Amino acid sequence: MTEENGKIRNISYFQAIFEAHQEEMLRDERVVLIGEDISLYTKAGILDAGLERRIFSAPISENGFCGMGVGAALTGLRPVVDLTIASFVYLAMDQIVNQAAKIRYMTGGQATIPIVFRASMWHEGSNAAHHSDRPYPMLMNAPGLKIVVPATPADVKGLIKSAIRDDVPVVVFEDNSLWFQSGPVPEGEHLTPLGVAATRRPGDDVTLVAIGGAQKVALEAATALASEGCSVEVIDPRSLVPLDRPAILGSVERTGRLVIADPANRTCSAASEIAAIAAEEAFHCLKAPIMRITTPDIPIPFSPSLEDPLYPSTEKIVDVIQKLQ
């Protein structure tokens, strides 16, 4: 993390996203934005009007404009492609997984793809099955991509800026439930390194790894459990690829217990991968089974009364950790 002037402000997650875009576009003329309806960014005053010539509104063809971004990256630009909703990743899998992720390997490093794909993960608000997925586990299985899931305003700004400067394709999964939550963000230059986890709360009894939007309920659960004498260490991986294994394993070796809260579906999830790593490399330290708190393997329903109970919650985390004691 770096900062120019030492000033800290409270701004929203949403503001931090576009502050990162603006700063990087002003810093580097190779940075361009591609996506649906994004010309509205300057018209609405979200970005400076002077940046309009580097903002390209595309037709509703995710595979098409992601391909445009890959081509732009090959010519030396640094495109940021806004997929709007994370579920639309499926429509662009060929460009993201088959092209962006592989070209550097297939050319022996002669070609680089400095591209960022932004995908907003929607839940709550009855967005239904076609708009509510969290497909980051699928992309974790695509060698050549970096995957980040920022949970705070400071990290969404710092990770987007670092992603734009990276020569490897990066997919940024933003949780829209965090958009209007505010937090401290350094003013000026601020970078969050990819592949470095953050310990949000120290603890001695249980390691709780919480991904993206699950951070909020994880910290609430840790506070509730502290009143019962249970000390929970909360870790935010921030990056899923590369994953900060030493931070997670070091915590598990101290606490002997691991719980993972992941808002994505259960099977073949980031939670599953973290659990497997701990079982392989820290089994000798474990005092209890590794537990996962995830969304079940079903399409997300439209009805709020059916949707809301699916995600990791404070109550679910507290219940699981109490049973480990």
Language model features with spans:
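Thiamine diphosphate
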Residues: 1-173, 176-325
